[in-house]
């Protein structure tokens, strides 16, 4: 219709222009990051911060960019769900509900106690404190995937803890909503828990009875585009459904991926979704950079610097403590603690809610938001420090049971194939001895918890050692 604004080409152009601009700038940021040997996440965050510094943040605050940023996190959680079949959730239940709850109690409880000790209102101390105990799913999972750590002990534990944190974030959002409405907290939390259990049950039923027939029907159609459309539909529709139920969109996306994880079509679905995940995640990280207020950094740089250092230092130390309490080794606890040592995108959402932000001084809330955003940007560097420190601590004598002369399996090289073999052997409690000639790969494998020796398998002398 001529009078319909949606049919006006100028209106359409104005709507999509911010997204197109960020997409083009994001490509440049990714290329620059690679040229500087930095993680692309740093480039995206830096781009957002630079645009904010130029006073252009408001140009990109539209609903389209926000929706694309949210979609990026949804696709990330959908991809994570693809790796967590029902069998794996049962196998990782100790990490998810045991280690995950322990980490939240230690880190979140400590931050809540710290806020209360500084005289902040109890409601703010509890909600903001436990929000600071959360880590960034988007950043951590991105790093884990980039490093090929999905199936190593540290990677599995990190993913499990993040799943529990996603559930905890939902409860915090419910608590913040009850605070805003003045309603009773316990009934609200109980309702949220019941909804989450119902969503999980629906995902289990979908996985058991509908996934295989659905994709079998699509396979008979023989059209690859339908696979792509179906994968997108499951990820987005699952998130939409939980969002309509008052839960987080990301929980629904995770459950959607989990529903497909046990099917024979998982690899195909993951292949179709990967490109969208990377594309939309770039919008999320740029949006985080845009949220940093440069004027605040200049005016209150000492406060922001102090809060940032305190956040990262305390978070890493508390995570390490949680690992040690969970009977992890010192090197493993250090690597995991540093990997999860940043703030969370959910914390940014919680601190932006008027019911929460209104309980503390705006200056403090702004400093917390800036500190969280900065912690996301420096996560690759902080994580590398933890990884190298763990590698040095692990450089002592190897575990005799798994890496001694009597180990029944010899692995040559710790490339992805070698790591996959080692993961399978460790999962089945079978000893192995791994050899790696490349020093960098040796250090990374050592830091990731593998039982590996530095040796050149092509040298005959190695076989007599």
Which residues are covered by each model-predicted region?
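Transmembrane helical cores of multi-pass secondary ion antiporters/exchangers
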Residues: 1-416, 422-423, 458, 462
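A solvent-exposed beta-alpha-beta segment
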Residues: 409-465
């Amino acid at each position: 219709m001529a009078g319909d604004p949606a049919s006006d080409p100028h209106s359409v152009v104005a709507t999509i222009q911010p997204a197109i601009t960020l997409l083009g700038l994001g490509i440049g940021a990714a290329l620059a990051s690679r040229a500087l040997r930095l993680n692309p996440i740093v480039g995206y965050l830096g781009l957002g911060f630079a645009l904010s510094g130029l006073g252009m943040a408001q140009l990109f605050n539209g609903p389209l960019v926000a929706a694309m940023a949210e979609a990026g996190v949804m696709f990330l959680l959908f991809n994570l769900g693809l790796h967590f079949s029902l069998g794996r959730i049962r196998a990782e239940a100790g990490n998810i509900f045991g280690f995950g709850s322990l980490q939240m109690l230690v880190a979140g409880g400590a931050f809540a106690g710290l806020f209360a000790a500084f005289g902040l209102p109890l409601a703010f101390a509890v909600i903001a404190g436990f929000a600071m105990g959360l880590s960034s799913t988007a950043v951590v999972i991105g790093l884990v995937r980039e490093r090929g750590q999905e199936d190593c002990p540290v990677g599995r534990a990190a993913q499990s803890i993040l799943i529990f944190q996603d559930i905890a974030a939902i409860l915090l959002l419910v608590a913040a909503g009850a605070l805003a409405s003045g309603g009773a907290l316990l009934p609200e939390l109980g309702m949220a828990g019941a909804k989450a259990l119902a969503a999980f049950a629906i995902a289990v039923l979908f996985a058991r009875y509908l996934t295989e027939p659905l994709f079998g029907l699509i396979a008979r159609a023989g059209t690859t585009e339908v696979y792509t459309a179906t994968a997108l539909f499951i990820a987005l529709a699952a998130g939409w459904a939980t969002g309509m139920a008052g839960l987080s969109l990301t929980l629904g996306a995770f459950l959607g991926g989990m529903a497909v994880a046990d099917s024979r079509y998982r690899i195909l679905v993951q292949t179709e979704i990967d490109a969208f995940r990377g594309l939309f995640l770039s919008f999320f990280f740029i949006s985080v950079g845009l949220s940093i207020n440069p004027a605040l950094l200049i005016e209150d740089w000492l406060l922001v610097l102090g809060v940032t250092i305190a956040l990262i230092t305390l978070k890493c130390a508390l995570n390490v403590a949680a690992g040690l309490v969970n009977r992890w080794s010192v090197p493993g606890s250090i690597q995991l603690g540093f990997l999860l040592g940043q703030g969370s995108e959910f914390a940014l959402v919680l601190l932006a809610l008027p019911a929460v932000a209104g309980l503390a001084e705006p200056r403090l809330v702004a400093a917390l938001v800036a500190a969280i955003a900065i912690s996301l940007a420096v996560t690759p560097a902080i994580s590398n420090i933890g990884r190298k420190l763990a590698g040095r601590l692990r450089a002592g004598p190897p575990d005799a049971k798994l890496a001694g002369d009597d180990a029944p399996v010899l692995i040559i090289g710790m490339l992805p194939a070698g790591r996959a073999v080692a993961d399978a052997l460790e999962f089945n409690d079978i000893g192995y001895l791994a050899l790696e000639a490349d020093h960098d790969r040796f250090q990374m494998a050592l830091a990731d918890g593998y039982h590996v020796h530095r040796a050149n398998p092509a040298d005959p002398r190695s076989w007599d050692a």
